[in-house]
Regions:
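Active-site-adjacent beta-strand/loop module that shapes the phosphate/pyrophosphate-binding cleft
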Residues: 62, 70-95, 105-107, 127
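Conserved N-terminal beta-strand and adjoining loop/helix that marks the start
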Residues: 1-22
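Conserved Nudix-box catalytic region and its N-terminal flanking loop in Nudix hydrolases
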Residues: 18-61
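Amphipathic alpha-helical interface surfaces
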Residues: 46, 50, 81, 120-123
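Residue-level signal for short segments within beta-strands and strand-turn junctions
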Residues: 12-14, 26-27, 88-89
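Short arginine-rich
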Residues: 60-63, 122
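Nudix hydrolase/Nudix homology domain
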Residues: 29-33, 89, 94-133
């Protein structure tokens, strides 16, 4: 049985005008909106990978939950397990490592969920429920 490769994703959020907003970035080819996500390097903890991806792909820093919000699995192009973390954004950079080929956009929960694949929509809605309760 082939091994499962690990990835980490992060849902960066802020509260603005009493509404939860989530930061999405374009894919590396600019063909859609995603949350920052990437491979967990050898010897790296998934949480640390999530922090790194938020900075590299979106230019965001903040407070990341110690435990993932959840996990989903991807079967295409090799089996992958993706741990999904939540980050309360405290710093937004104007320029970041991948800003030449990625755009960043803040969206309210319903708009962000509509842009994302089904496996991530559940996490976005769960985040909304947690923050508004």
């Amino acid at each position: 049985m082939p091994s499962v490769r690990k990835q980490a994703a992060v849902i960066p959020y802020r509260i603005r005008n009493e509404h939860v907003e989530v930061a999405l970035v374009t894919t590396s080819r600019g063909k859609g909106w995603i949350v920052p996500k990437g491979w967990v390097d050898d010897g790296e903890r998934p949480r640390d990978a999530a922090i790194r991806e938020a900075e590299e792909e979106a230019g965001l820093r903040g407070v990341v939950a110690r435990k993932p919000l959840g996990r989903y699995h991807v079967k295409g192009h090799g089996r992958r397990s993706v741990d999904v973390y939540v980050m309360r954004v405290t710093k937004i950079r104007d320029h970041w490592l991948e800003d030449k080929f990625r755009r960043r956009r803040w969206m309210r929960i319903p708009d962000a969920a509509a842009c994302l694949r089904a496996e991530l929509q559940q996490f976005i809605h769960h985040l909304e429920g947690e923050l508004e309760s």
